[in-house]
């Protein structure tokens, strides 16, 4: 499925960068033990690679001092995370606040323009365009400029809410079915 497949003739197109806040991550110094093993979940792409919509746990945690003394940022519940280096384009939505490393971007929709749940599903569609635009000599990288080059259709907010509810309901049913399959094995 492509952006053109979902665009309604009355929907306006916007550059992706004009409807989102793009947030960079960071890593506290690993040589300072006081920055690690705290209570703040710290995401890397290994924590959310896969088909699940939500990420709810992380392998590593940092302390408040680690967050305060590094370029790591704390994302909010509902924010979206996308891998930007190496394994480009892995995507998930946060089920709780988490910090994250510099190999990812946090994505927060501008609330007056886009519903956050709708944004997640829209990104699922444009992720292949983001991957195609990735570049790098050693490994693929999505840059801030990549988000400026992608145009997306936007229905009115009320339509976005309705679309996101339907798709969210389907995701919930898929998750239940997957849990049933896992317990049957």
Each PLM stretch: what is its role?
Residues 13-33, 46-77:
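Sequence-specific dsDNA recognition surfaces
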Residues 88-95:
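Short, Lys/Arg- and Gly-enriched loop/turn segments at beta-strand edges
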């Amino acid at each position: 499925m492509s952006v053109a497949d979902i665009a309604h003739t009355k929907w306006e197109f916007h550059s992706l960068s004009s409807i989102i806040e793009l947030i960079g991550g960071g890593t506290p110094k690993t040589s300072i033990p006081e920055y690690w093993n705290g209570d703040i979940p710290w995401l890397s792409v290994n924590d959310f690679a896969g088909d699940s919509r939500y990420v709810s746990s992380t392998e590593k945690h940092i302390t408040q001092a680690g967050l305060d003394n590094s370029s790591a940022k704390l994302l909010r519940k509902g924010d979206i995370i996308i891998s930007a280096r190496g394994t480009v384009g892995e995507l998930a939505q946060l089920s709780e606040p988490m910090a994250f490393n510099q190999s990812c971007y946090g994505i927060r929709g501008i609330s007056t323009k886009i519903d956050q749940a709708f944004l997640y599903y829209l990104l699922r569609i444009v992720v292949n365009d983001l991957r195609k635009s990735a570049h790098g000599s050693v490994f693929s990288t999505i840059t801030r400029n990549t988000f400026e080059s992608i145009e997306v259709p936007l229905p009115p907010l009320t339509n976005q809410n309705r679309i996101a509810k339907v798709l969210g309901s389907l995701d919930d049913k898929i998750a239940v079915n997957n849990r049933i399959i896992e317990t049957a094995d």
